[in-house]
């Protein structure tokens, strides 16, 4: 991935496109790579990632079985928030990832992921305190899916109240949604994982 569509390419060590199986039903979308992610080229490998792994287990999911990515694929300098023009420049990558992976459930972590994904699905974004733990139906990139909005794990590291809300969202709401899509009646995934792996890699080469 040698993208130069926004200024963030000037600061990155490695782009962090995302990782995980392409035949999964569940996609996790965070905000942007941090320092550790930039160094390793992998999403959620620092302290927030450790917490995410635990939260996923609370929802009945192992990290290895979900696809994990971010709204922007390169680290903003000093871990500042991504700017609107950086988010817009990077959005086609996320839309293509959704088109190829066809998740049934997207877990949006933090307000940037929540706002972008809800707007793409035709919903309004107000605030995390009002909307965390809510489930939204929608279509993104032609894929019918559900979005659950919750707090960013990094925000929960030093704030017990946020951590409590985040843990409840994963253990109750997200767990219930995961059980729902795993029921036999929800149907088999189509398409070969191998074919999608190839087209996703081709896409990032462009
Ligand atoms: N925070 C994010 O939003 N994404 C990462 O990949 C790591 C930390």
Feature-to-residue mapping (PLM):
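A polyanion-binding, active-site-adjacent surface
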Residues: 1-184, 198-205
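Intrinsically disordered, low-complexity regulatory segments in eukaryotic proteins
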Residues: 185-194
């Amino acid at each position: 991935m040698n993208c130069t569509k926004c200024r963030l390419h000037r600061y990155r060590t490695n782009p962090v496109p995302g990782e995980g199986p392409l035949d999964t039903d569940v996609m996790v979308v965070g905000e942007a790579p941090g320092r550790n992610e930039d160094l390793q080229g992998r999403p959620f490998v620092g302290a927030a990632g450790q917490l995410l792994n635990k939260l996923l287990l609370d929802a009945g999911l192992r990290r290895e079985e979900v696809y994990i990515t971010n709204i922007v694929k390169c680290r903003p300098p000093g871990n500042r928030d991504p700017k609107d023009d950086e988010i817009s420049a990077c959005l086609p990558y996320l839309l293509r990832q959704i088109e190829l992976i066809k998740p049934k459930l997207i877990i949006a972590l933090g307000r940037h992921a929540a706002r972008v994904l809800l707007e793409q699905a035709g919903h309004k974004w107000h605030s995390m305190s009002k909307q965390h733990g809510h489930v939204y139906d929608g279509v993104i990139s032609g894929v019918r899916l559900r979005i659950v909005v919750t707090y960013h794990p990094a925000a929960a590291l030093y704030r017990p109240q946020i951590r409590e809300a985040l843990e409840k969202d994963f253990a109750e709401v997200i767990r219930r949604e995961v059980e729902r899509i795993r029921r036999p009646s929800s149907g088999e995934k189509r398409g070969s994982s191998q074919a999608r792996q190839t087209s996703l890699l081709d896409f990032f080469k462009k």
